[in-house]
Each structure stands twice: as C-alpha cells, then as structure tokens.
Amino acid sequence: MKSAKQIATALLVGMFTFSAVGCSMVEKRPEAINSKVVATIYGNQTITRGEIDKLAKGTVEQLKSQYGDSYEKNEEAVAALKKQKEQILTSLIDQKIFLKKAKDQKITLTKDEIKTNVDDVYAQYQQEFKTESEFKSQLSQYGYTVAEFKDQLKNRAISNKLIQQVVKDVKVSDDEAKKYYDSHKNSYTQSPNTVHLAHILVKTEKEAKAVKARIDKGEDFATVAKQVSTDGSKEKGGDLGDIQENDSNYDKTFMAAALKLNDNQVSAPVHTQFGWHVIKCIKKTEYPVKDFNSVKDDIKQTVLSTKQKSVYQKTLKKWESQANIDKNEKNLM
C-alpha cells in the first residue's frame, strides 16, 4: 500500500503537469521561482524572490487572516503584498549598501556592542513571549531562524554605527535654534494651545457650498450639521470638542484651514481625503510661550535630528547612485 506521503507526491506531480499546459513547467517549480533575481547591486550581489518571499511571510499570514486562503484573488490584498515586497526590497538593497560601506571603512562591533545590540535586544524580544518555542514560532512566521534574526540585529547595529559616522560632524548653533524657535513658537507654549471646532462633512463640493450658503444666511450650524453631515459627530451638531493645535490625529489640510479661523468664524468648503468640510471655530485657547533659554536644548536636539536625517538621506542617495542597482521588479510577484 502506498504511503500518504507518496500519494500526496503523486497528486502534486499531477497538479504541476496540469497547470503547466501552455507554459514552461520549470517556471512552476518553487526552486525556480525562489531563485529569480529581483535586484542586482554592485554587479555581483543579488537579491532573489526567495529572500523577499521569506521576509514577506508575516504579511502573507495577515492577508490570509483578513481575506482567506484565496487572498491572491483579491486586488486589494495583492496590492498590499506588492507594496510590502517593494519595501522589503528597498530595505535589503540599502542593507547591502550599508554593509559594503561599513566593510570598506572597517567598521565592526566590539564585544560590548554585540552584547548591547544583539544579545540584550534578542533577550528583550524573547521576554515578550511566554515561552522560547512561542518566540521561535513567531520568528519563523516572519521568515527568520534564531541565527538569522541575530545576524539581522548585528547588521542593523553595524548600519547604525556607519550612520553615526556619517552624521558625526553635524552641529546646531544657537542662531539656528533661535530661528527655529521664532518660527515654531506655538509648539513651545506653557500648555498646548487648543481650538474648539465643529464641522459638517459632505461628499461633494456642491453640497459643501450649499451648506456654507445656509450658514451664511443665518441658519444654526449645529442644526444644519444634524441634518446633512455624514460624520459621526452630526448627533452633537458637528462638535469635535477641544483639539490641540498640533494634534496629528486630524487631517493636516483640515487643521491648517481650521487654525486660520477666528472665534465663531466659519470656513469656506475644505477638501480632504474624507470628503468636503465646512468648519466652525467656536473658540481658540492660547497660552504664553516659554522663554527661549528654557527650551533651547530641546530645540537643538530637534534641529539636530532634522539636519542629521538630511545628511543621511543625501549620503544614501549618493551611495545608491554608485551601487549600480539593477531592479527586475516583475519578479516580485
């Protein structure tokens, strides 16, 4: 009697034979797919489909959970997977560039740095799970063995050490800090400035203009909101309550328009990703600005981070232009 494994093997052979009609059978073999080159760097370093797919395993599991095992038939799911694979590809390319540059500059990790950035970090991750086997299972879901994960932590630490070398000469003067302070005073008030807002959300500009016309003619804002707004705040007359001026939970375009309003002023129609808004500023509450010297160190750190990021990005762009990157993104999917 044939074993279950032999029967399964026979079924798989039959499936591949059937699906190969009209195309090259070798293209259907997993090893052929895994070995497809997605990118070449420096002319001799490659990134394969298998490497990408391995690191995309976690995303695939999430998509299966959300869309079912046939997620590949869903355009939204496929688009999400493609986007994730593109991000993985970019990360792998940059990592290879970093590691080559680090090698060229003879940047390595000391024993203490390995303990801090590899062993200790690994232990921190492991503590998030009840058992070691549960942690290893999670690693496997995201495409890593323990050794590979530790290698990844080591590579990240080397890359960070290289980046610190790149930005080590970046400084911030008192004049730069004062200039930033003068143009961002609202971020350094004794308490966060707030604005009490209400809004009416509709689908089209035509509807928004009609809403604004009704308000301009003297109709009560809250009454109109309850009648026509599509937002959940309609039951409260569109009232959103007090919002901090720098609240990142709100759409930037929405907040920019709202902050231009004076107390009891109503905006013209404002378009955002959610639709068309008519916004009312009920009341602004503003607080005194802190003295420059009391916030100078914080500002210097903020400006330093921005300048370092700019130097890093320019350097990376230069390195990428020198890396002879050849992408074949059709092999991603």
From Swiss-Prot:
Origin: domain of life: Bacteria
Cellular localisation: Cell membrane
Domain PpiC per the UniProt entry, residue ranges: 192-283
Annotated GO MF terms: peptidyl-prolyl cis-trans isomerase activity
Membrane topology recorded in Swiss-Prot or TrEMBL: Lipid-anchor
Enzyme class: isomerase
Pfam families linked: Rotamase_2, SurA_N_3
Reactions mediated catalytically: [protein]-peptidylproline (omega=180) = [protein]-peptidylproline (omega=0)
GO cellular component: plasma membrane
EC number from the UniProt entry: 5.2.1.8
Signal sequence region: 1-22
Record lipid sites (S-diacylglycerol cysteine): C23
One GO process term, biological-process aspect: protein folding
Function: Plays a major role in protein secretion by helping the post-translocational extracellular folding of several secreted proteins.
Family: Belongs to the PrsA family.
Listed name of the protein: Foldase protein PrsA
Lineage: Bacteria, Bacillati, Bacillota, Clostridia, Eubacteriales
